[in-house]
């Protein structure tokens, strides 16, 4: 086996396989996290902006199972999937939720969102976009939660995506950014994917 194939995790690829094919053929640890998460809890705050319009729409349109928990008190989604159920209290969340929380809030609210996720029984947390503030990451670790990722959008690691996200994901794969390992250090240079 060639040196190149050994470096690709013993992948059995034709020597002339284009780089884009090689990039897409390899799986990423974050793919496993999001694709096997079950019904994760998406924590956001509608008083801070567009949440849950964009996120709710993206996850709903791809058939992903999730429960949306809004710290801002909004009980129905807005945007492309208006009217979908949004929870405002942890005690109202269905029992079949998984142990993964995706945090999509501004940094000033992130530590509170982590506490709410922990109250919901979540043991793992994924900070989407700019939500991975150092204080929130420290709070998650203090509560014994596993920090899965700081900065990247989980939609990029789903099997199915809405067209705009699919195009963005292809660009990330071609650029090499998709393959970077999960970021769990809040002090590292940020690799946010917007």
Predicted feature residues:
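Short, positively charged and aromatic/hydrophobic N-terminal segments
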Residues: 21-23
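Glycine-rich adenosine-cofactor-binding loop
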Residues: 38-52
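NAD(P)-binding Rossmann-fold cofactor-contacting core
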Residues: 57-79
């Amino acid at each position: 086996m060639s040196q190149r194939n050994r470096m690709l995790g013993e992948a059995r690829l034709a020597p002339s396989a284009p780089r884009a094919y090689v990039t897409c053929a390899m799986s990423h640890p974050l793919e496993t996290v999001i694709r096997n998460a079950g019904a994760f809890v998406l924590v956001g705050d509608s008083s801070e902006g567009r949440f849950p319009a964009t996120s709710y729409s993206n996850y709903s349109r791809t058939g992903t199972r999730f429960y949306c928990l809004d710290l801002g008190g909004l009980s129905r989604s807005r945007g492309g999937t208006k009217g979908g159920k949004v929870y405002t209290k942890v005690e109202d969340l269905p029992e079949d939720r998984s142990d993964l929380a995706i945090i999509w809030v501004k940094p000033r609210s992130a530590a509170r969102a982590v506490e709410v996720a922990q109250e919901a029984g979540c043991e793992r947390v994924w900070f989407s976009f700019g939500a991975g503030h150092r204080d929130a990451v420290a709070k998650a670790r203090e509560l014994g939660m596993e920090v899965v990722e700081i900065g990247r959008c989980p939609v990029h690691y789903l099997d199915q995506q809405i067209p705009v996200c699919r195009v963005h994901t292809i660009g990330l794969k071609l650029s090499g950014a998709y393959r970077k390992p999960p970021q769990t250090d809040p002090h590292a240079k940020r690799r946010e994917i917007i």
